[in-house]
UniProtKB/Swiss-Prot annotation:
This is Phosphoribosyl-ATP pyrophosphatase. GO terms for molecular function: ATP binding; phosphoribosyl-ATP diphosphatase activity. GO terms for biological process: L-histidine biosynthetic process. Keywords: Amino-acid biosynthesis, ATP-binding, Cytoplasm, Histidine biosynthesis, Hydrolase, Nucleotide-binding. It comes from the Bacteria. Gene3D superfamilies: MazG-like. The gene is hisE. The lineage of its organism: Bacteria, Pseudomonadati, Pseudomonadota, Gammaproteobacteria, Oceanospirillales. GO terms for cellular component: cytoplasm. Its main location: cytoplasm. The keyword Isomerase does not apply. HAMAP family: HisE (MF_01020). It comes from Chromohalobacter salexigens (strain ATCC BAA-138 / DSM 3043 / CIP 106854 / NCIMB 13768 / 1H11).
């Protein structure tokens, strides 16, 4: 998984400063963080709706969850790129949480 994310991050970095007329990623960056966040929110909502439909759905509705989640991850990576946060920081944070009870991890965050 991280190889695919690394490849995508490289493509996003290359397209960040491309011509907004020829690159969707460059166009998002040119429109600024608020537009990127709008897209992340939109894709999050679409993912939630697809998941709700898929709960008792068929393979097509389950595939819609996969497609919408891919859109959400993509736009989240664009957001990270815009903020100059390497996707590896997120992967490192997930790795750090392995072996830690979810309840303990949540309690530690709340005590900060």
């Amino acid at each position: 998984m991280s190889d695919t994310l690394a490849q995508l991050a490289d493509v996003l970095a290359a397209r960040r400063h491309a011509d907004p007329e020829s690159s969707y990623v460059a166009k998002l960056h040119a429109k600024g963080l608020n537009k990127i966040l709008e897209k992340v929110g939109e894709e999050a909502t679409e993912t939630l709706l697809a998941a709700k439909d898929a709960e008792h759905g068929d393979d097509a509705t389950r595939q819609a969850v996969v497609a919408e989640t891919a859109d959400l991850w993509f736009h989240s990576l664009v957001m990270l790129s815009h903020l100059d946060i390497d996707h590896q920081a997120v992967l490192d944070e997930l790795a750090r949480r392995f072996g830690v009870s979810g309840l303990d991890e949540k309690a530690a965050r709340q005590s900060r």
